[in-house]
Amino acid sequence: DEAAERAAALVELLSPFEADEGKAPAGRTPGLPGMGSLLLPPWTVTRYGTDGVEMRGSFSRFHVGGNSAVHGGVLPLLFDHMFGMISHAAGRPISRTAFLHVDYRRITPIDVPLIVRGRVTNTEGRKAFVCAELFDSDETLLAEGNGLMVRLLPGQP
């Protein structure tokens, strides 16, 4: 198949430029949608501070689970990404998600502007309890999530 051959040739052409983890732009470029990661939803950070984080964006046909609604598994990815940013914005060291819970309140549509806002709600030693809400442009609550981020121990992968 010609498309597959071209894709393979492109991968080979770019292979000398592969960057190590921590040096690649993916997930490290806040000015790009999805922070430069192909995995993350292509949203843009609009507020980033110790009191919380806000992102704006939309989902497309690539995120559909059926009937023009966002696939339910996409929202935990959005919230997990948000929880990591919330923890970092609050000045906490690198942490890992220990728990993530999502409540789906309404169908999340594609191709409409959406807003997600989140914050740290409590801290206990290595633990940061976080929450976030997903809204449409009318501020209708579509989903909400809460989670637990745990600071990594020295040398922990």
What do the predicted segments below correspond to?
Residues 82-114, 120, 142, 149:
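Hydrophobic beta-strand-centered segment that forms part of the acyl-chain substrate-binding groove
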Residues 2-69:
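Long amphipathic N-terminal alpha/beta scaffold segment
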Residues 48-50, 95, 111, 125:
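Short coil/turn motifs at beta-sheet boundaries
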Residues 57-59, 104, 151:
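Hydrophobic residues in beta-strands and at strand termini
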Residues 38-41, 98, 128:
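Short, basic and Ser/Thr-rich N-terminal targeting/leader segments
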Residues 1-26, 108-110, 121-157:
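HotDog/MaoC-like acyl-thioester-processing domains
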Residues 47-52, 70-92:
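Active-site helix/loop of acyl-thioester processing domains in fatty-acid/polyketide metabolism
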